[in-house]
């Protein structure tokens, strides 16, 4: 017997239809009225409170108003902020939706008289050829119904209220029927190829739980040793498991051999077995929440060590170790969020339309990341700024005695919208690495491959920035945004390469506009990742042989200062090479004539990939109201570009130090920022920003811990 299979050609990726939306089949679909589109009123921009603030602080976003250009030793408090009218709430506009007709019945065609039969032997006369009649598509039935409002809300509620619980467990036993319902829910989870690769090992034995607790504690101690001091201090206060406090522990495993060699869906995706078991974990978790049971996922285990300790078959993989029990309460926020360890990322950060990077929530027009970020940047908060200056006057010290630190503490208050401001700890320095085509012009004595070698040095902990970061307790985050060489996958390296180095800007643009925007996006995404991970301060860092040449070109464009006055010696070049470096910058500016009013165009013409990424980091930090401590000349060049894109972004910037490079002095003057440290540093890597970090943290801590005259019972003068 021969079986002939005729397969209809289907699109590779068909989008699921929304309820009530017509879906085209193989035949022409019946036309259905589209929902009427009613424009929704755009919300008015939030009024920006403005108060008159005496030098050295103003409430506008530009730090030129926060940190005055003139050297001010004793800042004066601002005037009382004027109350602003509260805008009336806008009326909610609801779009009317035209409902889809339940069915469409085609009209019947009239019957036609039969044609006369031809006589025998006669040839039929040719007649007009009629077009084939179009057969209308049959009406389709309504889609399968969803849940009613109450049922849908119950499903969504259990998802919203699911929590990873580590505290507040009770010793109440779990009834067998309750545990059975939870396991049945887990067992109904979807699995690739219907392989159902999971097993559930239910542990009640106090002895076994004690053994697992010891294994977890050993891994916790090992992890703590890897953390920078700022993170280690936070981690010490966290409870990571409740193995001994819960009456039931459940181990969820995955069997990668279940279903045999030809399990559907695992031909090219062998990892689908543990992925499927993870779905069973989620089902279990949601069902447990519905039953009033708390669940805590413990991941501090060596997986093979756990398999042996529990006597599991060696071919099984452990997906989850869960602590299950009744709890006193379910917290409104995740415990890690409450502890300041991390923050929930907004949905808008992770939804892309058609292609990665075209961000849009359903119903929105796609927009780029830079546009979204700039729209979220706001000035310093006038109310918190005023409260900071008032508190400074009441603290047990002479007015102005802390100098620049008082200005910084007020800036931090205005940025965070609260006084006292959060202490900017933990902190992370983002070291963006990229190479430069202008290296071919002989502007440095260092070979280009040093960039990649230094990236490896950062990851190995052997660079100066690593030593300084260890001293101040900061994390070092290394991002390959444009290293010319291919870097091996290494723990701690973020591979975000836009292109392998820029082009030589003496012969053409350093990069395209699209590449520039992509590098800016890398910086914004890095800021988002680091802040969502719980960091409260961002520091700029960079690595790229020949990047001071690029910095000089950028600073010359944005300040208008001649390249001869701002181009320094970088890594210590001789007079001949320095003269060549100045000439290279001049030729590039003459070739491109970059317009400072188009900062993205300036970066594309004469910028670097790491400079563009630092621009993104500054903008990203400002949009998240997180302080950004700037390093040296390259960071100064990036800050000039960031200010040109969004002037209010400088409200988040703090000048960590003054570099020995003359271009950095010009940049700081243009930005109106006073540096905290002046040690003739010219290394980069974020080293100057790291040295300044404790000063920034001290400014905030003083606002928290220094008593006022009233609270301390100290008489004022």
What residue ranges belong to the model's regions?
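Long, low-complexity intrinsically disordered regions
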Residues: 1-146
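N-terminal amphipathic, basic-rich helices that act as targeting or association modules
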Residues: 43, 93, 101-103, 118, ...
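N-terminal targeting/leader regions
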Residues: 131-172
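Small-aliphatic-rich amphipathic alpha-helix that forms the alpha element of a beta-alpha
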Residues: 182-187, 250, 258-309, 460-476, ...
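Glycine/small-residue-rich phosphate/adenosyl-binding loop
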Residues: 196-277
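A glycine-rich helix N-cap at a beta->alpha junction
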Residues: 220-228, 240, 311-338, 512, ...
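C-terminal helix-cap and adjacent tail motif
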Residues: 321-377
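N-terminal loops that bind phosphate or other acidic moieties
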Residues: 369-717
